[in-house]
Amino acid sequence: VTRQLAEQLTRGTALRVLDVGCAEGTQALRLARAGHFVTGIDPDPGILAVAHQALAAEPPEVRDRVQLLTGDGHQVGRWFGPRSFDLVLCHGTLMYLPDPDPMLASVARILAPGGLLSLLVRNGDALAMRAGLTGDWRACQEAFDTTRYTNRLGLPARADRLAELSGTLAGFAVPVRHWYGVRVFTDTMPDEAAPVDGRQLGQLLDAEERAGKQDPYRHVAALLHVVCAK
């Protein structure tokens, strides 16, 4: 996702960034280190405390470019005015919203003209893949006919079908500019099975990056990275 996002950003330009659902602040801090001004919001005070700890370990020039707030995506329209941000990230957020349209509408309003919206969502067109690859055939059959699922944390969640999401975003005047597949080959890989050798890990990431850009591979990815432009 980091590599994909970097492809879409103009090099050498400091952006005003909003990270909705910033969690531990991984992406927010990475962007701040690159010279961007980042506001991160998350509804979980506990996980936001982890982000504050990580921020405290950064150099002063990075800390000065980051603001962390407790809240959720539904509040962005009240907190920020139109054209407030050049880039908005909503990574792993939409899947927990029964109806994401109100938040997407708010995000579209606070984007500046030419601004980018980066979404990371569960791929509703390939929801049966994980269950099928792990041999859970009942769950596989059920997944063909729904966009609802239970995630690995045991929480209810929802997936997005690309065509439907694209139509919604176009209606909010933030049409899709590009989209990628994420976790094409590694969705069923246990965390402990990830390569520890740096060379092998690099090969894995290169393979995922390449597959995420190409048909038919990206269509069966577990996640979709959708980049929109206002």
Residue ranges and their predicted role:
Residues 87-99:
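A short SAM/SAH-binding and catalytic strip from SAM-dependent methyltransferases
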Residues 116-144:
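Conserved class I S-adenosyl-L-methionine
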Residues 178-230:
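Conserved Class I S-adenosyl-L-methionine
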Residues 155-173, 179:
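Short alpha-helix
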Residues 1-13:
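Conserved alpha-helix/loop element of class I SAM-dependent methyltransferases that forms part
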